[in-house]
Regions:
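Positively charged n-region of N-terminal signal peptides that target proteins for export
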Residues: 1-4
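Bacterial N-terminal signal peptides
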Residues: 7-16
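Intrinsically disordered, low-complexity N-terminal segments that are enriched in acidic
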Residues: 21-86
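Low-complexity, Gly/Ser/Thr/Pro-rich intrinsically disordered linker/tail segments
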Residues: 26, 30, 43-51, 57, ...
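Generic recognition of flexible, low-complexity loop/linker segments
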Residues: 35-36, 63, 113-114, 149-150, ...
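Non-catalytic surface loops within mature trypsin-like serine protease
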Residues: 52, 77-79, 100, 199, ...
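Secondary-structure boundary elements
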Residues: 91-152, 160, 226-228, 238-254
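Hydrophobic/aromatic-rich core segments of domains that either
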Residues: 157-244
Length: 254
């Protein structure tokens, strides 16, 4: 077995063990949500009250302040919610997870020729959306595996989107957090993963898994996949200490 495959096998085992404790099979799971009927225009800022296991740490990541001893804090979801990443990273390199330099990408590169020399974020997102079968939960596959199998859920869409963006010289990263989805009557929150691409110095959501719901979804980032090496699963598991336990929708921001 190749070293990469062996390491990936151990990573998957660790991930499965970690999920067994909370009975989660895929990264997409329901978060308890309080949401009275509220009219919020698409793209408008939204006020929410977040309850988390370590609210102070999460609030600091999101650039807001949580009161000492409080278990929840208020947060306004804007157009481009984001958290700061490592300042010394370009988010362009091929890594163990975002491994666009592997041979499994060769057939995909041929299919991407129609995208031109520098595709837009929308083009990449649409390409991944139609390429990956979203009804096949996997569990944080490497980008090269997604390129070969073309199966997965939100995490597979995210890593493949980031890989293709970097392949074209566009800074991209993977974010883990909450997708807050509106049905026109209220909101429901789900654990989610998505890619972000850098445009004019701003990180912008590039979510191929929820392309069809793009007008009705808002994002609450909790952390980045900072470690894209062999220890990526343990890095992601560390975010569980700050996981959002409940979302209460307060209404549109003033």
């Amino acid at each position: 077995m190749r070293p990469r495959a062996l390491a990936f096998g151990f990573a998957c085992l660790a991930l499965c063990i970690g999920r067994a404790s909370d009975a989660q099979i895929t990264p997409l799971f329901v978060i308890p949500t309080e949401s009275a009927p509220v009219a919020v225009a698409a793209g408008a800022s939204l006020r929410v009250l977040l309850t988390a296991s370590e609210p102070a740490k999460l609030a600091d990541k999101l650039g807001v302040r949580a009161q000492a001893g409080a278990t929840s804090f208020e947060y306004t979801i804007g157009a481009y919610p984001q958290i700061a990443g490592s300042a010394d990273r370009t988010w362009l390199e091929a890594t163990f997870v975002i491994d666009y330099d592997q041979p499994e990408f060769a057939p995909l590169k041929t299919e991407m020729t129609d995208l031109g020399p520098k595709p837009t974020r929308a083009q990449i997102v649409e390409f991944v959306n139609r390429t990956v079968d979203e009804n096949t939960p996997r569990g944080w596959d490497l980008a090269s595996i997604v390129a070969k199998r073309r199966q997965g859920d939100c995490s597979e869409h995210a890593v493949l989107t980031a890989a293709i963006a970097r392949l074209y010289g566009i800074p991209a990263r993977v974010t883990v957090g909450i997708a807050l989805l509106s049905d026109g009557k209220g909101f429901a929150a789900y654990g989610h993963a998505w890619a972000e691409m850098q445009e004019a110095g701003t990180w912008v959501v590039a979510d191929a898994a929820m392309l069809e719901q793009a007008a009705n979804v808002r994002y609450i980032p909790m952390g980045l996949m900072e470690d894209e090496g062999m220890g990526y699963v343990m890095s992601l598991a560390g975010l569980s200490n700050q996981w959002i336990q409940k979302v209460a929708v307060l209404g549109p921001a003033d």
